[in-house]
Amino acid sequence: MIISTLAFACMNAIVKHLTDIGAFQIVFFRSVSSLFFTFGFLIKNNIPILGNNRKLLILRGLVGVTSMSLFFMSTKYLPIGTAVSLRYMAPIFAAVFAIFFLKEKIKPFQWLFFTMAFVGVLILKGFDTNLDGYGLILIFISAIFSGLVYIVISKIGKGDHPVVVVNYFMVISTVLGGVLSINNWVNPEGIEWIMLLGLGLFGYFGQVYMTKAFQIAATNQVAPLKYLEVIFTLLLGVLLFSEIYTLYSLLGIALIIFGLVLNALYKGKK
């Protein structure tokens, strides 16, 4: 999951620069470039492309592309850091969904730790009274669908290879992203081509390792680690974009790490 969050943070940094390209077009390029990796891996290793749990695989693809599209759309209305932070309502939704769909139990102390980490995410970027209402709605719905992604992957379990799961997601995203971007297509120029292809590279590794994580561990144990993506994104902001963060940002990072460590220790004792 740590490898996954680092890869997604790199992808977020790229999205930050693609302000002139529509969300569905970004979805298309992010997905189509990943297909070279997924199809290549499956063919090389003689893994059945269609998989076993086909209905769940299709559902995972549809839920995933919905969440991803809404997230990219929200970045047009919200700062990328704010969008990434607010998307981290997803593990909270995943933990709640896991109670009903996976029959997992979450102890009261774990809810306290989840809350601590979530408060840290909010503090990390501060409270902005000028946030766009439409953007907030988009990112909120994106977080709900992202939480559902975790549940579907857990339902698939070890019945399908992680790359098969990712491949379904990429195929569905390529088709839907391509079709929905036709009317608003913008021809990339220069370095934008490299950035768009980079979306697929980082997105591929992010999806594969996230899928592996949820296949081998309980949702309520793995999902909170997704908060690390916020930390990685902020570090990239400092290193690549010379962004400056306040003491409130440092407090937010401390709360996130503290909440995750306490949850891991608590789960270990149980």
Label the predicted regions.
Residues 1, 52-62, 106-118, 135-140, ...:
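Cytoplasmic-side transmembrane-helix entry/capping segments in multi-pass membrane proteins
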Residues 1-24, 130-155, 270:
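Glycine-/small-residue-enriched transmembrane alpha-helix faces in small-molecule transporters
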Residues 1-6, 35-59, 108, 158-160, ...:
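Membrane-interface interhelical linkers
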Residues 5-9, 39, 61, 65-69, ...:
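Hydrophobic/small/kink-forming positions within alpha-helical transmembrane segments
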Residues 20-22, 28, 50-54, 126-145, ...:
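Juxtamembrane helix-entry segments on the extracytoplasmic side of multipass membrane proteins
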Residues 25, 32, 73-102, 219-236:
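Specific alpha-helical transmembrane segments that line the substrate/conduction pathway
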Residues 84-89, 156, 160-172, 207-239:
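Helix-helix packing/entry segments at the starts of transmembrane helices
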Residues 227, 231-270:
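C-terminal-most transmembrane helix of multi-pass membrane proteins
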